[in-house]
Amino acid sequence: RQMCIRDRNNTDAEGRITLADAVTYAKQCCGVDRIVDIATLTDGIQTALGNRRCGAFSNNRALTAQVEKGAAAACERMWELPCDENLRRVLDSRVAHLKNSAMGSSVGGYATVGAMFVKEFVEETPWIHLDIGGTAWTTECEGIYTKGGIGFGTRMLYETFKVMEKEGTQV
């Protein structure tokens, strides 16, 4: 898919545009056969899951299982949420291929809508999106985490790549 024209109806949702461009570039120029992306995409994910668990959205159960194993090994929590096609419709635009947010809509599900935007560019490539919007920063010390930016997801990705290698998936 070309880096298509988007209706930027929310200037606070620019990160998902950059992420969509990165996904498109990876597919078209690098020939990737799976995509694992991680981003502080929405505040809505913290409302849903709190600040110690990231949200995961995927189109591929096998890839999700590998990331779940990596998360468990890293002691970082994730929760899979649905890619709800009923929420996808709020991204339809009258003037472009796609709106970049559900701004002006009352449907809610903003973390899902953000992931659905990125999913448009993934198409059929096995993909998982980890929304770390609620987990990137903490104001309290707890376990391995100290106050401030905590690097949530770094250990998870490292452990996931080890799982992939062990299972014979080319990393």
Q: What residue spans do the PLM features occupy?
A:
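A generic structural signal for tightly packed, nonpolar segments enriched in small/aliphatic residues
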Residues: 2, 6-171
